[in-house]
C-alpha cells in the first residue's frame, strides 16, 4: 500500500501481503456481519434521533468502504493491479475517507451523548423525520461536491505511477503543502480524541461516585458504557496510526530510500483503522441482554471479594 516505495526494488512488498490479507479478511467478514446485525436493530430505533442518524450514516460509510475491500484482497493475493490507475486511486483514497468519516460520526455520537448527560435530557432528536433526512443528505452532498472532486483532481496526480502496482502514493508526501495538511489533520484528530477521552473519564468517575454499588442498576450507566465502545475503537484503531503518522511523514520527507520497517508499520497501522468496520457488530453485541447479565455477574463477583 500507501506506504510502499515506488522504486524498482520491491523488497517492501512481500513482508506486507500476508499480514494485510489476514486483516482485510477480518474487516470484510466482521464488517458484513455487523452491517446485517445493525439493520435489525435500526428498525426498532427512533428515526428522528440524532444518534440514530449518525449510526445510519456509519452503516453507509462502512458499506461503501466494504465494497472496495475485495479489490484490495484481489491485489494482495495476485500481486498485480488489473483495474486501472483511476480506480486504484479511488480504492486507496476510500481507506482514508472511511477512517475520517467514521471518526467524524463517532464524534457526533459521543458529543450528543455527552450533551444528554450534562443537560440531563432523555434524548436529542430532530423535530421531524424529514429534518433528519435533510441533515444527512446535506452532509453527503458536501462530501460528494468537495471531497470526491478533490480526491479525483489531487490524489496521486503529482507523480508518475505504474498502473500494475497500486497503493504506492507515498511520494505525494514529499511536497511541503501535502505534509502540512497531513500534520494539521493528525493534530486535530489526536486533540479531539483526547478531549473526548477526558470527558468520558470524567463522566464515568462521576457516575461511579454517585451510584457506587448500585451502578449497574441504572440505565444511564449502560448508555455511557456504549460510549466506551466508540472511545475504545478510537484508541485502538485510529490513534496508533495518527501518532505513527507524525514519524512517518518525517521519514518520507527526509529519506529517498525504501524504509522497510517504516513502510511495514505504516501499512499495518493504516489497515487496522479499517477494523472499525466491526464497530456495529460490537454495538449490537454490547447491547444484548446476555452481555449485560455477564457484566452484572462479574461486578457482583468483584464486590464479593
Curated annotation (Swiss-Prot):
Extracellular side: 1-22, 72-91, 153-184, 249-267
Compartment(s) where it occurs, according to its Swiss-Prot or TrEMBL record: Cell membrane
GO molecular function: G protein-coupled receptor activity; oxysterol binding
PROSITE patterns registered for this protein in UniProt: G_PROTEIN_RECEP_F1_2
Keywords, ordered alphabetically: Cell membrane, G-protein coupled receptor, Glycoprotein, Membrane, Receptor, Transducer, Transmembrane, Transmembrane helix
Transmembrane domains' residue ranges: 23-43, 51-71, 92-112, 132-152, 185-205, 228-248, 268-288
Domain of life: Eukaryota
InterPro entries membership: GP183-like, GPCR_Rhodpsn, GPCR_Rhodpsn_7TM
Pfam family, one: 7tm_1
Mode of membrane association: Multi-pass membrane protein
Family: Belongs to the G-protein coupled receptor 1 family.
Classification via PANTHER family: G-PROTEIN COUPLED RECEPTOR (PTHR24237), G-PROTEIN COUPLED RECEPTOR 141-RELATED (PTHR24237:SF35)
Name used for this protein in its record: Probable G-protein coupled receptor 141
Protein's organism: Mus musculus
Gene symbol of the encoding locus: Gpr141
Amino acid at each position: 500500500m500507501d506506504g510502499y516505495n515506488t522504486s524498482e526494488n520491491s523488497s517492501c512488498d512481500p513482508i506486507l501481503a500476508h499480514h494485510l490479507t489476514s486483516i482485510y479478511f477480518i474487516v470484510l467478514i466482521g464488517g458484513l456481519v455487523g452491517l446485517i446485525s445493525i439493520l435489525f436493530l435500526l428498525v426498532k430505533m427512533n428515526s428522528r434521533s440524532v444518534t440514530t442518524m449518525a449510526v445510519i450514516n456509519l452503516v453507509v460509510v462502512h458499506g461503501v468502504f466494504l465494497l472496495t475491500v475485495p479489490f484490495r484482497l484481489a491485489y494482495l493475493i495476485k500481486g498485480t493491479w488489473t483495474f486501472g490507475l483511476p480506480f486504484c486511486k479511488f480504492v486507496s483514497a476510500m481507506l482514508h475517507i472511511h477512517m475520517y468519516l467514521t471518526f467524524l460520526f463517532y464524534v457526533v455520537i459521543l458529543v450528543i451523548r455527552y450533551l444528554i448527560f450534562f443537560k440531563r435530557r432523555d434524548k436529542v432528536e430532530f423535530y421531524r423525520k424529514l429534518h433528519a433526512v435533510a441533515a444527512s443528505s446535506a452532509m453527503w452532498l458536501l462530501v460528494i461536491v468537495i471531497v470526491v472532486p478533490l480526491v479525483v483532481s489531487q490524489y496521486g496526480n503529482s507523480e508518475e505511477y505504474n498502473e500494475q502496482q497500486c497503493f504506492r502514493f507515498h511520494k505525494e508526501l514529499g511536497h511541503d503543502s501535502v505534509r502540512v495538511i497531513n500534520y494539521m489533520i493528525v493534530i486535530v484528530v489526536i486533540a479531539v480524541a483526547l478531549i473526548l477521552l477526558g470527558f468520558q473519564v470524567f463522566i464515568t468517575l462521576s457516575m461511579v461516585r454517585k451510584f457506587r454499588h448500585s451502578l449497574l442498576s441504572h440505565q444511564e450507566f449502560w448508555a455511557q458504557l456504549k460510549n466506551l465502545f466508540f472511545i475504545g475503537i478510537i484508541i485502538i484503531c485510529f490513534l496508533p496510526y495518527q501518532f505513527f503518522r507524525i514519524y512517518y511523514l518525517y521519514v518520507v520527507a527526509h529519506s529517498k530510500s525504501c524504509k522497510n520497517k517504516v513502510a511495514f508499520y505504516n501499512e499495518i497501522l493504516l489497515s487496522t483503522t479499517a477494523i472499525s468496520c466491526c464497530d456495529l457488530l460490537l454495538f449490537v453485541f454490547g447491547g444484548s441482554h446476555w452481555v449485560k447479565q455477564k457484566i452484572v455477574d462479574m461486578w457482583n463477583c468483584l464486590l464479593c471479594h
